[in-house]
Every structure is written in C-alpha cells, then in structure tokens.
Amino acid sequence: PILALVTGKPVYMDDVAPKDCLVVKVLRSPHAHALIKEIRTDLAEKVDGIVCVLTYKDVPKRRFTMAGQTYPEPSPYDRYILEDRVRFVGDPVAIVAGETEKAVDMALKRIKVTYEVLDAVLDFHTAMDNPVLVHPEDDWKSLCPVGADNKRNLCASGVDGEGDRKS
C-alpha cells in the first residue's frame, strides 16, 4: 500500500485491512418514518462466519448527537445507535459483523423486519408544529439553551429583531 500511495495509485481500506479483522455492515431502513414492530435475526445468526448481529434490543440506550460540534454541543441529544423508530430512509436498523463480506451480505438478507410505516415530515418548511413528531420521546435533551423543543420538531430556534439605537 505504501508504494501505491507514493506513486499516486488508489489505495482502499480493504487493501490495508488486517487479515483477521471482521467485516461490519449495517441494515438500513427503506422507510422515511416507521416503527419496528418485529425484527427477526435468527436466520442471519445461523450463517457460517457470522460473529454478531445487533438490533435496538442489544445496544445501550444512551442518547448522543450526530451534529459533530464540540462539547457541550448545542444540537440535541436525540439519537441511539439503534432504536425501534426509524426517521429517514437509510436509518440504521441492525448491525452485522462476520468473518467475510459474503457471509455478512447473506446475513443482512436474512434479517426480517416488520415495520409500521408512519407519516413522515419531508419538508422543513412544514416541520415546525407539525402533528407528526420526528422525536416524540421524553428522554430527548439539548445541553445548551438554543430553543430546542422536540414536541414542536425544533432542534433550535432564534429571534431576530432590531433594538432602539437612540436609547
């Protein structure tokens, strides 16, 4: 890989991955907003070479923010690693780790998910005070006072105005 790098040839992570590392992939939601009513992983777990299959039932329930600011982040702590509610197409549903990419791909196809599809908020112009809440949960929080209110679909709000320049 070093020679390829210095000669300007493309190098991919798979080119430098240790031979004994696991392949990890994520099953993602096909829905913009839905509840996971049932998720069956038993057939995926039986695939040769599969080491681990995780769903919302298996991961810690500790919220975090995905916004990427420094601490204390003004963006809301509104995400779990995996949860039983998906909020966008591509939201993670399950994580599979295995010895080969072929095994992981096969396991992903064997995970069976039953969704209750919900109305989605697809336009930020109509999101505020929409009856469809993106984050209806009670353990949602914002570390900084930026006007966040999950019961109004607000991750932040502000006020703009002019003061009295003569006083």
Predicted segments with their positions:
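Accessory "access/gating" subregions that flank catalytic or transport cores
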Residues: 159-165
